[in-house]
Amino acid sequence: MGYPMHYNNTQEIWDEMRKLSPKFTGATYEKIDALGGVQWPCYDESMDDKGTMFLHEGGHFATEDGRGNLLFTDYEPVKEEVDEEYPMSFCTVREVGHYSARTMTGNCRMLAKLEDEPGWVAMNPKDCEELGVAQGDLVRVRSRRGSLITRCLPTERVKPGSTNMTYQWWIGACNELTNTALDPKSKTPEYKYCACRVEKLDDQAEAEAYVQTQYALIRSKMGIEKAGANV
């Protein structure tokens, strides 16, 4: 669009944002430094406006009658239940160290040291024991729509019979497994629940070689590294 984008520091960026959004206007760098942080909305640059700790103070809401209106809807069961063929539930979650599909963070070496391909599938230790897999083992996760290879992560934070997987990965692309059934009104896909099964991979060396080869090829196609390079 030809808009000039030269900034000398992050404060200049923030100052421009403050001018464009009234709710941020009062949150100057000076005020943030003095108070240790400012919660928006903060409308006035003076120190009298210290931001808003919480909305609707005094119990008054931005509605016609000033009361908070709680809306609800009838429960609708998931479109795909677990069964003998796919006995575990599958949910996608966010990876702390990366953003969305890693378009902006996937090539940062520091973030790759936190977590990297092909991601993890979190499982209850009881399920891991029954399957005969340990932390870091490569496993195959399969649903009615596809399959992928990822690493096993035993954790008590997941209930027996359940799994979850972060959706940031290119090889461990968990949205290949998710259900595309739509909510009838919002048309939101049912990405957060489907049936799956986890399979043990007996030849870990072969699976590891596959992951590294695929990762190198992906990075080569992106113009990052030559295929076969150390990733």
Regions found by a protein language model. Give the residues of each.
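Long, low-complexity segments enriched in small/aliphatic residues
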Residues: 10-110
